[in-house]
Curated annotation (Swiss-Prot):
Subunit annotation: The RNAP catalytic core consists of 2 alpha, 1 beta, 1 beta' and 1 omega subunit. When a sigma factor is associated with the core the holoenzyme is formed, which can initiate transcription.
BP GO annotations: DNA-templated transcription
Stated name of the protein: DNA-directed RNA polymerase subunit beta
Top-tier EC class: transferase
Role of this protein: DNA-dependent RNA polymerase catalyzes the transcription of DNA into RNA using the four ribonucleoside triphosphates as substrates.
Protein source organism: Xylella fastidiosa (strain 9a5c)
Any one Gene Ontology cellular component term annotated for this protein: DNA-directed RNA polymerase complex
Keyword Nucleotidyltransferase applies: yes
Length: 1388
């Protein structure tokens, strides 16, 4: 979408998509890999000065573990800073050598030893040193990690946010169906604390899901007495006891509501409530109005109430009644006798003031703080004898020290918000005013002065009681406000911290030695645990996944994936329907369409196009601010929690030119409900119609016309498209193709603007604009190396090809080279095919696809796959294996593709079974027969000591060898082939560096020339003083003599000196880089233990489309190719054009993916417009006419914002160039939920001079007769998926057998047989094919003697079968014997 103001870049001028979007794009699609790249950048903070680093990532992990203090406290190891070194090998070398791409981490630590003798902490000595802490993996520019030579992605995890959550059991625990409420405090690390009600309304607590204890034990362990507990949780009613009889209640009218009194309630004048009637809210109001402050009640009214305090006889000090005991008649008598004038009771009722804590205190066996702490100790450590210190320390370490407990910034924010506090910041530990004010250490005093009167645990229990009392609501755990994203950086930080904690334990032990023995920090710290933790995480964590590299889209989608699985997450089996379902809060944050089918459905999600994570890790999505019914261009990001309070309108709401909402009622969302509101009520508006979907779903045109299930399949299947030989842009796209291709990193984009200086298949050189050159050392030349024929993770081919010519002027960001599945910088996953919807002789039954032979002929769906085959020579017990061309018992012909080192040469075309690398393995000495001994003695034959174990081409594969790599262990002599490869590689690198240097040197001389030509000379070679320098003079001069020139002009002299310094600096840098590369190439390789030599052979396999391959459109319309039909038999149009693909029309109505029909219509129009442009070009039409026609296509409808294309910016040549690119079809963009309407499609068909109905008359290819009725014909972007028949087809005659059952193995990978199962056996039984059945069950399966005999018989030419005993019967007999039942077979 372009406004008239913006100018078009070099790439955009080549081809412009006609956009049908009605809405102006307010916000550019953000960088799609930001969630990965930003997260890891923040973790490393590699480009930030040590002193400026924020408290996150590596820095935070190191700070949290250090300083490490020895047990005696006399030695400490402090953290100063860290720095990342340079990676040893670059990305390409790591991929090639199977290494991990990372940089060494060096941490500066300071060892401080204190003087033992001194009373104050006097420092004895300090030692500061850099310590190596292992390799930290580095992320590539494209958001991946290279681990052991393969690209991996760390998928972000969606997990339950730390904080406090209130929930209930949905009535499932107790038979009565009563809702049992619970609360849970979840920290980032540390023990979980649960509170839960039982069916009798007592409140219990659990720590780490262990056995439950009454909650009062926890409160008592914090230091609260019974009275304090009751005071915290209940309001108190005060009764004044009259000396003779009767009681006065201090009246709070509200507290009487709902009670039934046994006496008349009067206000001095009249009766307000009669005895036996319930007091209602109306009565309460009357009482408040009457202003009565005290109420005389009979003694019976006090009986059964619960005392809030201990009642003590003031004279004797005797305890008359303890807090939480009930008042009875005897106690009232005792109170009067002791002269107690007032008592407090708890205000409780069954309606909304439950006596929960009072009930709980009655079942609490403990009386003192220590008893309670001991009880908790017993529960946490059953079987260990508790001591006072142990119990106190364990309790303190559970929730109150940062070493063991961390709520984290997020957890504290969520906690404070949920318990209703204003401030969101706070301490990472749980705080309790009573507990910390009773302790008397420095940390406790700091916390008390900072946090004062708050108490976390009390607040949670109060909140839970409020919910149980009917005030307050439970949390929705599936709401995105309660689930947060853990990205790479955070996970890496946690793993790093775990490694450091392991190191800490070891260092503490050694620190006590350091005091006496004077060890250095390097000797104290062993980096292995850190390195091991990191290696394990990146190598084998559930969230570290082998990157899906089928095509650029699959890469981008994989990096934007959010998984609820993984460590600390859910498991497939336990996840219920609610977690997987689409939630209201997903809007704009998670894609509502794209998720896998199968067991992971809903657990793995994709990030929506505009979504991002905020500082706390919650997903947020952008909205445009609406002020008084007018939409502004101000964009604000709101998280799921924040957007709950606003009314938000949809992106396609109608507005006038000033942004005023024009509808009287606007469709909006508010608190998860869809409603209609007047414009003045609207707070925000969506930024884009495609806000709710992910990148893959946003690539499906007319998505709004597809059923959601099919849209899901369409989005998922685009990720499986194999890059075709020549990518072809989709005629009908959505306008986001360019963004995806750019952000995926498969294309080469200009870093800076300039002029193309050189181009070849492997390199592009750009001479940078003067204005963009930075610094004196910058030569102003950018060199881009292209990737050629490289294997991807999925064995598809990655290849880049240049798009520019010498002399082209490019700006920053322009596409210089296309990668796989991209066409002029746009994502192009498939091919645009001419499609007809009609049945054809049953060949498109059940979603089958009928293809024309022309498709195969033109290589439209031909793909290249690169297979890597490896041969390893190991050191065995019997001797070492050897790679050589000297292999026993192999014909000359089988070896004719190998060189003298036994390795296949590059360019060889090989078939299944051909030897690629000759290898022999020593075999054990076998007993020789006398004849063999004699032959040995005569001929000295020793070759039979080795057996052939060569690398052969696997069955079902053929191709061309495109590359061979030989890796040799250090200290083992390299063979001739290894030397050849090494020499070639060094030559290539040398040429590369020489070229780069020559280009840079040329650029420097060219710039210098422009600065000194025309200047007057003072001195120089072959020139007199006072002469003027000319271009001809410089051409005749040796380049090195330029630097001897001296002028009057100081600036020119400076330019000469600067150029000389630049060239010398580059020379030095290139020499250094070349020697580094050379030493890397010549040094031995780091191979696995026991491996002497490894040879990798790369085969390029060309796969044409054939019956059995799976294909699909973008709307979930998938099928399998059933037949490839000669062109002459295909249905053809009036002008003789045969169709490419025939699809079954019955695949559309029941599937409800109508989007494909609209795509076909619009695609036909796009192609037709291309034909019209081609006809104009062939007729040499005037440029003005061409301009007018293009204007007619692009700028017809002024109301459509996305359509305006400013053709006046194009020169005639540029216009002609673009027109040539459009002859194949004018690409269209129909954005998701904002696409082309039926009228617009008809208009386009009309403009293309095609029938507006979208149907045309087809003729039968066999007979040439017209079909009975017109057919829907048009162009659809169709994909070939990575489910190829060649990879699945498999057959075996003989092969490996299972050890136990002696039946053939199963599966292609094991070269197994076809399973002849139960139903197949029944089929043969039904046919009465007894001999065939016997053969199947014996000699073809597991009758060992029978199959050996069969082989002998066939060799002897005797085709008889003798079936014996199947091995599986013997297995059955053994199993029965294991049950102590003996079975013996009797000879019959």
């Amino acid at each position: 979408m372009k406004d008239l103001m913006t100018s078009y870049s070099f790439t955009e001028k080549k081809r412009i998509r006609k956009d049908f979007g009605k809405h102006r794009s307010i916000l550019k699609v953000p960088f799609l890999l930001a969630i990965q790249v930003d997260s890891y950048r923040a973790f490393l903070q590699g480009d930030v000065e040590s002193s400026q680093r924020k408290d996150i990532g590596l820095h935070a992990a190191l700070k949290s573990v250090f300083p490490i203090v020895s047990y005696s406290g006399n030695a400490a190891l402090e953290y100063v800073g860290y720095k990342l070194g340079e990676p040893m090998f670059d990305e390409r070398e790591c991929r090639q050598r199977g290494m991990s791409y990372g940089a060494p981490l060096r941490v500066t630590v300071r060892l401080v030893i204190y003087d033992r003798e001194s009373s104050t902490k006097a420092v004895k000595y300090i030692k500061e040193q850099e310590v190596y802490l292992g390799e930290i993996p580095l992320m590539t520019e494209n958001g991946t990690f290279i681990v052991n030579g393969t690209e991996r992605v760390i998928v972000s995890q969606l997990h339950r946010s730390p904080g406090v959550f209130f929930d209930h059991d949905r009535g499932k625990t107790h038979s009565s169906g009563k809702l049992l409420y619970s609360a849970r405090i979840i920290p980032c690390r540390g023990s979980w604390l649960d509170f839960e009600f039982d069916p009798k309304d007592a409140l219990f607590t659990r720590i780490d899901r262990r056995r439950k204890l009454p909650v009062s034990i926890l409160l008592r362990a914090l230091g609260y007495s019974n009275e304090e507990i009751l005071g915290e949780f209940f309001e108190i009613n005060t009764f004044h006891i009259n000396p003779d009889k009767g009681v006065q209640l201090e009246l709070v009218p509200e507290r009487l509501r709902g009670e039934i009194l046994s006496f008349n309630l009067t206000d001095g004048g009249g009766v307000i409530v009669e005895a036996g009637k319930r007091i209602t809210a109306r009565h309460v109001k009357q009482l408040e109005a009457s202003g009565i402050s005290a109420l005389a009640v009979p003694d019976e009214y006090l009986i059964g109430r619960i005392l809030s305090h201990d009642v003590i006889d003031a004279t004797t000090g005797e305890l008359l009644a303890s807090a939480n005991s009930e008042v009875n008649e005897d106690r009232i008598v005792a109170f009067r006798k002791a002269g107690i004038d007032s008592v407090g009771t708890l205000w409780v009722n069954d309606l909304d003031r439950g006596a929960y804590l009072s009930n709980t205190l009655r079942i609490d066996p403990t009386r003192t703080q220590l008893e309670a702490q001991v009880e908790i100790y017993r529960m946490m450590r059953p079987g260990e004898p508790p001591t006072k210190e142990a119990a106190q320390n364990l309790f303190h370490n559970l929730f109150f020290t940062f070493d063991r407990y961390d709520l984290s910034m997020v957890g504290r924010m969520k906690f404070n918000r949920r318990v209703g506090r204003k401030e969101v910041a706070g301490e990472p530990v749980l705080y309790d005013k009573k507990y910390f004010s009773d302790r008397n250490d420095e940390e406790s005093r700091r916390l008390v002065s900072k946090l004062g009167e708050t108490s976390d645990i009390l607040d949670v229990i109060k909140g839970l009681c409020e919910i149980r009392n009917g005030r307050g609501v439970v949390d929705d755990i599936d709401h995105l406000g309660n689930r947060r994203v853990r990205s790479v950086g955070e996970m890496a930080e946690n793993v790093f911290r775990v490694g450091l904690v392991r190191v800490e334990r070891a260092v503490k032990e050694r620190l006590s030695m350091a005091e006496s023995e004077g060890l250095t920090p390097q000797e104290l710290i062993n980096a292995k645990p850190v390195a091991a933790a990191i290696k394990e995480f990146f190598g084998s964590s559930q969230l570290s996944q082998f990157m899906d590299q089928n095509n650029p889209l699959s890469e981008v989608t994989h990096k934007r994936r959010l998984s609820a699985l993984g460590p600390g997450g859910l498991t497939r089996e336990r996840a219920g329907f609610e977690v997987r379902d689409v939630h209201l809060s997903h809007y704009g944050c998670l894609c509502t369409i794209e998720t896998p089918e199968g067991p992971n459905i809903g657990l793995i999600n994709s990030l929506a196009v505009f979504a991002r994570t905020n500082q706390y890790g919650f997903l947020e999505t952008p909205y445009r601010k609406v002020v008084e019914g007018r939409v502004t261009d101000e964009v604000e990001y709101l998280s799921a929690i924040e957007e709950n309070q606003y009314v938000i309108a949809q992106a396609n709401t109608l507005t006038d030119d000033n942004g005023q909402l024009t509808e009287s009622f606007v469709p909006c969302r508010f608190q998860g409900e869809s409603l209609l509101k007047p414009p003045s009520y609207v707070h925000y508006m969506d930024v884009s119609p495609m806000q709710t979907v992910s990148v893959a779903a946003a690539l499906v045109p007319f998505l709004e016309h597809d059923d959601a299930n099919r849209a899901l399949m369409g989005a998922n299947m685009q990720r499986q498209a194999v890059p075709t030989l020549r990518a072809q842009k989709p005629l009908v796209g959505t306008g986001i193709e360019r963004t995806v291709a750019r952000d995926s990193g498969v294309t080469v984009n200009a870093r800076r603007g300039g002029v193309i200086d050189q181009v070849d298949a492997g390199r592009i050189v750009v001479k940078v604009n003067e204005s963009e050159i930075i610094g004196a050392t910058d030569a102003g030349v950018d060199i881009y190396g292209l990737i050629k024929y490289t294997r991807s993770n999925q064995n598809t081919c990655i290849n880049q090809r240049p798009l520019v010519n010498v002399g082209d002027i490019v700006t920053s960001g322009d596409v210089l080279a296309d990668g796989p599945s991209t066409d002029i910088g746009e994502l192009a996953l498939g091919q645009n095919m001419l499609i007809a919807f009609m049945p054809w002789n049953g060949y498109n039954f059940e979603d089958s696809i009928l293809l024309s032979e022309r498709v195969v002929e033109e290589d439209r769906y031909t793909t290249i796959h690169i297979e890597e085959l490896t041969c390893i020579a190991r050191d065995t017990k019997l001797g070492s294996e050897e790679i050589s061309a000297d292999i026993p018992n192999v014909s000359e012909q089988a070896l004719n593709r190998l060189d003298e080192s036994g390795v296949v040469y590059i360019g060889a075309e090989v078939r299944a079974g051909d030897i690629l690398v000759g290898k022999v393995t020593p075999k054990g000495e076998s007993q020789l027969t006398p004849e063999e001994k004699l032959l040995r003695a005569i001929f000295g034959e020793k070759a039979s000591d080795v057996k052939d174990s060569s690398l052969r081409v696997p069955p079902g594969m053929d191709g061309t060898v495109i590359d061979v790599q030989v890796f040799t262990r250090d200290g083992i002599e390299k063979d001739k082939r290894a030397h050849q490869i090494e020499e070639y590689e060094i030559k290539r690198v040398k040429k590369d560096f020489d070229d780069q240097f020559r280009i840079l040197e040329g650029a420097i001389y060219a710039r210098l020339r422009s600065q000194i030509v025309g200047k007057v000379v003072n001195s120089g070679v072959d020139i007199k003083k006072g002469e003027v320098i000319t271009g001809a003079y410089l051409d005749g001069l040796k380049k090195s003599d330029w630097f001897a020139l001296r002028m009057k002009d100081e600036v020119a002299v400076e330019a000469i000196d600067r150029a000389q310094k630049q060239i010398q600096a580059y020379q030095k840098e290139f020499d250094q880089r070349f020697s580094d590369k050379r030493s890397k190439i010549t040094q031995g390789d780091d191979l696995a233990p026991g491996v002497l030599k490894m040879v990798k052979v790369f085969l390029a396999v060309k796969r044409c489309i054939q019956p059995g391959d799976k294909m699909a459109g973008r709307h979930g319309n998938k099928g399998v190719v059933s037949n490839v039909v000669p062109v002459e038999d295909m249905p053809f149009m009036e002008d003789g054009t045969p169709v490419d693909i025939v699809l079954n029309p019955l695949g559309v109505p029941s599937r409800m993916n109508i989007g494909q029909i609209l795509e076909v219509h619009l695609g036909w129009a796009a192609k037709g417009l291309g034909h019209r442009i081609q006809r104009m070009l062939e007729a040499n039409a005037a440029i003005a006419d061409l301009r007018k026609f293009l204007n007619e296509i692009y700028n017809h409808d002024k109301s459509v914002v996305g359509e305006r294309v400013d053709l006046s910016q194009f020169s005639d040549d540029e216009l002609l160039n673009m027109a040539k690119n459009l002859t194949d079809g004018v690409p269209m963009a129909s954005p998701v939920f904002d696409g082309a309407s039926e009228q617009e499609i008809k208009r386009m068909l009309d403009l293309a001079e095609l029938p507006t109905g979208g149907q045309t008359q087809l003729y039968d290819g066999h007979t040439g007769e017209p079909f009975d009725r017109k057919t829907t014909v048009g162009y659809m972007h169709y994909l070939k998926l990575n489910h190829l028949v060649d990879d699945k087809m498999h057959a075996r005659s003989t092969g490996p057998y299972s050890l136990v059952t002696q039946q053939p193995l199963g599966g292609k990978a094991q070269f197994g047989g076809q399973r002849f199962g139960e139903m197949e056996v029944w089929a043969l039984e039904a046919y009465g094919a007894a001999y065939t059945l016997q053969e199947m069950l014996t000699v073809k399966s597991d009758d060992v003697q029978g199959r050996n005999q069969m082989y002998k018989n066939i060799v002897d030419g005797d085709h008889q079968m003798v079936a014996g005993m199947p091995e599986s019967f013997n297995v059955l007999v053994k199993e029965i014997r294991s049950l102590a039942i003996n079975i013996e077979l009797e000879d019959n």
